[in-house]
């Protein structure tokens, strides 16, 4: 009797769960069919090289389909598992059926709409499209369905077929009866578990290293930027861009006047070092939190200050050093686009923004076109910070992370493999790359909680803040890296570029202001000793590395860049940073703050290095010329970003 009562209470619930799972499975099938149609219709643009590549993209697409399906089905899941006997009535079941069919039909319409729209944009639709076409006549969209009637009919047919199949799925036949406590308890457990799993699935994984899956993660599964749309689906693209800040379309001046003050098109080849290092390998070392403050050799004006980078101090004596180096951002996730592609964050990190699918001019891709092999090294768990996805978008062909290192005994317990161990791995692994090569390495040990291996805790200087010893550790790790690298046959034929991802406010008051917080070392080391010196006059930034490195190795083709080449003294030298909606422009001895509408501050960094005196209303300053240049810069940047024109030399405006 007890078993029968419990069964009569739980059997309808089991049928409801089975129906929910079958609906999820059907959704996966529908999304895959839409992806297949997308692929067939746009195969000429996708340029898929092999069946293996196609299979990988479809496999990767399931990850994004899962995220979209669980998010769009969250209401259905909740309503299906509510501990209510009324949820098994015929009327309630019809309501669930209607909800599921409406949501899935909308997904079909969105996905098939992008089958055609992709041919105009080469990316999935995001919420930016509603801003872009917000003022257009809505009947223009209806015309879209008429003009592409074949896809419209296909969509109608797919919706009808979907509804027929969904109608044949078995429904619960009865309401729960008997021991209702078992029904209520089991329903609550299933409801809570389903909501938790939905959040995890929508986020993209269980691990603490996993950030919410976003558009740029699709780059893991592709070979060409335009293929990303095949991996993604349109509901996911729309969901992931909800609430993402979009850039305003600045209209400070006619576009014809913009090049008078700033020209984003740059042609290398006119500096004394242009092409001097043609055919050289390039190793780019991105040092986590490598602030200028830590380097004694860059703070000789501070009496008695030694710093915490004795190796870097010695290396700078044999290098070319930009003493006025700046980061363009304050986060690691923003540094990668700036360093690799001269792309500043569009209010939010580029890789998390609605513009992350834009075409970019990237250093690895340009070098690849010149015959370079390309690799990226980062000792964190693969997928951390979305680096693997972005560097593939930037054209990197080989990725080496914690997975490839394959020795968890060297894991620091927080971020990844200790720098000392991983940099030795990098030095050895680089030798397997075909020359000429481009290899980038992103360190990680000088990061909170600023731990160092136990054997060095009593050896390395501790300084006054925990960060100091962590910096000293990475400096030591780099010394050992160069010792190993110097014994390799590729060493003398390599240019080494050392830059920070961002600065970190430390102990010195000189760096506790809006400009000091961005100051970083930028160092170019040539083992042959052909490039030695100090540039104490010109500004340099992360965004300058793209045009500068390409100029050094002999790429003389024009490019779009929002950085510059500090070796080129014919162009104005300035740096722009986005400080949470306030743009900071540093030019000469001045720092200008601008909120997009009005100037909020101007400081003379030479006479007022601590930025205590706002002189924006003082006459005789360079504010007018700086403001015109900044406005031209922002107007061109925002327009190119919004309309995916970051690679076009002469776009139609």
What positions do the PLM features span?
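Transmembrane and membrane-interface helices of multi-pass
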Residues: 2-232
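Short, motif-level signal for alpha-helix interfacial/capping segments enriched in acidic residues
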Residues: 43, 92, 265-269, 479, ...
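Conformational gate/switch positions in structured elements
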Residues: 66, 115, 142, 289, ...
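Soluble catalytic regions of membrane-associated enzymes that act on cell-envelope
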Residues: 204-560, 569-574, 579, 609, ...
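Membrane-interface soluble catalytic domains
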Residues: 529-653
């Amino acid at each position: 009797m007890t078993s029968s009562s419990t069964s009569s209470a739980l059997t309808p619930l089991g049928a409801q769960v089975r129906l929910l799972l079958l609906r999820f499975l059907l959704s996966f099938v529908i999304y895959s069919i839409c992806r297949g149609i997308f692929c067939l219709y746009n195969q000429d643009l996708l340029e898929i090289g092999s069946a293996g590549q196609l299979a990988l993209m479809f496999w990767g697409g399931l990850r994004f389909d899962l995220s979209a399906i669980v998010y769009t089905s969250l209401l259905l899941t909740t309503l299906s598992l509510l501990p209510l006997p009324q949820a098994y009535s015929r009327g309630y079941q019809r309501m669930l059926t209607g909800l599921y069919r409406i949501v899935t039909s909308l997904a079909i319409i969105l996905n098939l709409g992008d089958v055609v729209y992709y041919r105009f944009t080469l990316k999935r639709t995001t919420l930016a499209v509603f801003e872009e076409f917000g003022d257009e006549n809505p009947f223009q969209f209806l015309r879209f369905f008429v003009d592409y009637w074949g896809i419209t009919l296909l969509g109608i047919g797919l919706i009808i077929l979907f509804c027929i199949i969904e109608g044949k799925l078995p429904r619960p036949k009865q309401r729960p009866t008997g021991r209702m406590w078992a029904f209520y308890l089991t329903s609550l457990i299933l409801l809570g578990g389903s909501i938790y799993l939905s959040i995890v699935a929508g986020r993209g994984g269980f691990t603490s290293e996993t950030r919410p899956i976003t558009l740029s993660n699709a780059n893991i599964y592709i070979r060409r930027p335009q293929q990303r749309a095949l991996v993604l689906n349109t509901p996911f693209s729309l969901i992931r861009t909800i609430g993402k800040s979009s850039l305003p379309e600045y209209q400070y001046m006619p576009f014809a006047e913009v090049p008078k003050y700033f020209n984003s098109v740059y042609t290398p080849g006119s500096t004394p070092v242009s092409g001097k290092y043609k055919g050289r390998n390039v190793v780019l070392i991105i040092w986590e939190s490598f602030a200028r403050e830590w380097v004694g050799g860059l703070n000789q004006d501070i009496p008695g200050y030694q710093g915490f980078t004795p190796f870097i101090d010695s290396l700078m004596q044999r290098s070319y050093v930009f003493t006025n180096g700046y980061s363009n951002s304050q986060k690691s996730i923003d540094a990668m686009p700036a360093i690799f592609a001269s792309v500043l964050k569009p209010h939010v990190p580029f890789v998390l923004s609605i513009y992350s699918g834009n075409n970019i001019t990237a250093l690895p891709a340009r070098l690849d076109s010149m015959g370079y092999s390309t690799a990226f090294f980062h000792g964190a768990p693969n997928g951390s910070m979305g680096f693997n996805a972005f560097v593939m978008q930037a054209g990197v062909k080989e990725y080496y992370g914690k997975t490839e290192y394959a020795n968890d005994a060297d894991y620091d317990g927080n971020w990844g493999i200790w720098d000392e161990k991983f940099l030795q791995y990098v030095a050895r692994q680089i030798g397997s790359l075909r020359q000429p090569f481009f290899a980038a390495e992103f360190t990680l040990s000088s990061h909170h909680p600023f731990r160092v291996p136990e054997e060095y805790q009593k050896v390395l200087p501790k300084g006054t803040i925990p960060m100091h010893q962590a910096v000293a550790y990475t400096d030591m790790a780099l010394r050992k890296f160069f010792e190993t690298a110097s014994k390799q046959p590729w060493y003398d034929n390599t240019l080494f570029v050392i830059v920070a991802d961002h600065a970190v406010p430390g102990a010195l008051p000189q760096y506790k202001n809006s400009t000091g917080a961005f100051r970083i070392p930028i160092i170019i080391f040539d083992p042959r000793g052909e490039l030695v010196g100090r540039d104490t006059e010109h500004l340099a930034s992360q965004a300058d590395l793209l045009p500068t490195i390409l100029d050094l190795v002999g790429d003389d083709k024009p490019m779009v860049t929002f950085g510059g080449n500090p070796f080129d003294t014919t162009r104005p030298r300035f740096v722009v940073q986005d400080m949470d909606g306030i743009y900071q422009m540093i030019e000469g001895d001045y720092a200008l703050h601008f909120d997009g509408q009005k100037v909020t501050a101007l400081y003379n960094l030479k006479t007022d290095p601590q930025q205590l005196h706002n002189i924006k209303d003082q006459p005789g300053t360079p504010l007018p010329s700086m403001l015109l240049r900044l406005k031209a810069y922002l107007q061109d940047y925002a327009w190119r970003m919004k309309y995916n024109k970051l690679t076009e030399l002469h776009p139609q405006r």
